[in-house]
Amino acid sequence: MTKDIIAESVQNDLRYLQLLARSFPTIADASTEIINLEAILNLPKGTEHFLSDLHGEDQAFSHVLRNASGAVKRKVNEIFSNTLRESEKKELCSLIYYPEDKLELIKSQEQDLEDWYQVTLNQLVRVCRNVSSKYTRSKVRKALPKEFSYIIQELLHESSVEPNKSAYVDQIICTIISTGRADDFIIAMCNLIQRLTIDLLHIIGDIYDRGPGAHLIMDILCDYHNFDVQWGNHDILWMGAASGNLVSIANVIRMCLRFGNMATLEDGYGINLLPLATFAMEAYGDDPCALFMPKTKFADNAMDEKTTRLIAQMHKAITIIQFKLEGEIIRRRPEFEMDDRMLLHHIDLKRGVVHIDGKDYTLKDTNWPTLDPKDPYRLSIEEEDLIRKILHSFESSEKMKKHMRCFFRHGGMYQVCNSNLLFHASIPMNPDGTFKSVRILGQDYKGRALLDRVDQLIRTAYFKTGEQEEVEYAHDYIWYLWGGKDSPLFDKSKMATFERAFIEEAETHKEEKGAYYTLREQEEICDKILDEFGVTGMHRHIINGHVPVRSNQGENPIKANGKMLVIDGGFSRPYHLETGIAGYTLVYHSRGFQLVQHEPFESRAKAIEEGLDIKSTTIVVELSSHRQMVKDTDKGADLQSQIKDLEKLLYAYRNGLIKEKERMER
């Protein structure tokens, strides 16, 4: 920047620079900050982890965070390659992953605990020193627990190998042990290692669904140091339920009952399902509900025959209510073009058939005691009373409100970060590769504008701010996003819930995928989408989840010559057989991209007691031509902008446009 340009720019920004001068009141202050920022720009970029489609599998998710997708184990192997046996390295890793539980186990087995403390504390200091090496001291300090901040800083920055400091470092460790603080210190160090190994976490949708622990995943995320989430179709269903959308509420209950996992509903959010159980027993007491038996293979708890039958009755009851409620929205919103999803009025119970697309199909279940053939979409008095009670339960859940606030604060329909475009499922497209126009409240949107508008409507549905017409539309639209043909979170011809439940013929179950899912295999289409979202850089990518990658059938998660990465590898246990693996983590560190392919996680107990880790295979996706530094990232661009502003402030000071002030001593 030339002197003339600086002078003109300073004059234009003088009011802002006067505000900046409050933080940097002297030339020395501004100069020091420039030096600090320039130094940060030349540190290696932090490690980003990308995960998707967790589907309530809290134990596997928690373990992947704790072991940083194998990064902790790799660092332990590098540091102690020839100085520790494999069994000792395994024990150290297990301690880092689960410090509280592992300590209890070790204290019950270890004969010389003081010696173990001495050895282990020194090992943890070495690991922590390694994982903190790419960060500034300031950043590490902010991550430290307050009670041990000073001590950990001393241990990280002083070496026991240095003759002048060896006694000093040794005495710190001895005193930690003698004062009875070793356990707390070990826990603090292990948590710090976990935190520093992952700098930024991206969740590309579907925290919720069939698994038992979505609420536990949300508990972890709400306390996590740095993350973002791109909403998925299952997430939007729960967001709709939290917004008071009755169809979304019926859907989430149906999904939980279908897989026999009520933990998130009942234990996590305190949803009272007793009214549903009472209604189901009365309405379907003599009905075997054979089509609605829960898929108990992956249920959170073993169930006896009586419980299984009750869940089947509840499952059927809420399914029929769901179809009725869907009909109300579809009639109210003809612009959704979902008339083909209104099937109740096509049922002929006397003949036991349903009429679809000019053909009669035999119903597998003809016991519909709450269906009025004259007005099939009308809820019975008992159903209305039931859904009102369930709605109250959802609206009263404080834990759900907390999790949703976190979801909105850290989430969105998409994210652009460090030359990567992240979204869960789709960008609606035409078969010719152009962006598909989607009409919302009388106006057409496509591409990035569509996702921005959808994001806005989701927030309107939950927070209920704005014009009444838009609030009411958003309240219905949040359900449309779950199964509407032009939803960026679905993008299929239909959701065949009714057909799969009641019709044998597989031809009726077919859901045609939108054009995006085939077009994304082409590099030029990916470039078109990246351009639409303003993603720049030599190495730019789209990162999706949503569609499981069947690696056991030879399917490749890396598509379009490396421009497209699909990382739904099947965290959910029911998908393990389908994909052949148990999930992916995409890791983006200073040297490039790696895709980590996980085997199934056995259990937290085995990880603690036997040191059993997830077996992972690392695939190199892309190596950078040079090591990526902070200056190569979005954060680096922000820092460079700050440096330019500080340089203008220096110019203003040195040319008398702003007067220096003495810094007040604190």
UniProtKB/Swiss-Prot annotation:
Signal peptide: none annotated. Pathway: Carbohydrate biosynthesis; gluconeogenesis. GO terms for biological process: gluconeogenesis. Its EC number is 3.1.3.11. The keyword Manganese applies. It holds the Pfam family FBPase_2. GO terms for molecular function: fructose 1,6-bisphosphate 1-phosphatase activity. It catalyses: beta-D-fructose 1,6-bisphosphate + H2O = beta-D-fructose 6-phosphate + phosphate. Its cofactor is Mn(2+). Keywords: Carbohydrate metabolism, Hydrolase, Manganese. InterPro entries: FBPtase_class3 (IPR009164), Metallo-depent_PP-like (IPR029052). Belongs to the FBPase class 3 family. HAMAP family: FBPase_class3. This is Fructose-1,6-bisphosphatase class 3. It comes from Parabacteroides distasonis (strain ATCC 8503 / DSM 20701 / CIP 104284 / JCM 5825 / NCTC 11152). The lineage of its organism: Bacteria, Pseudomonadati, Bacteroidota, Bacteroidia, Bacteroidales.
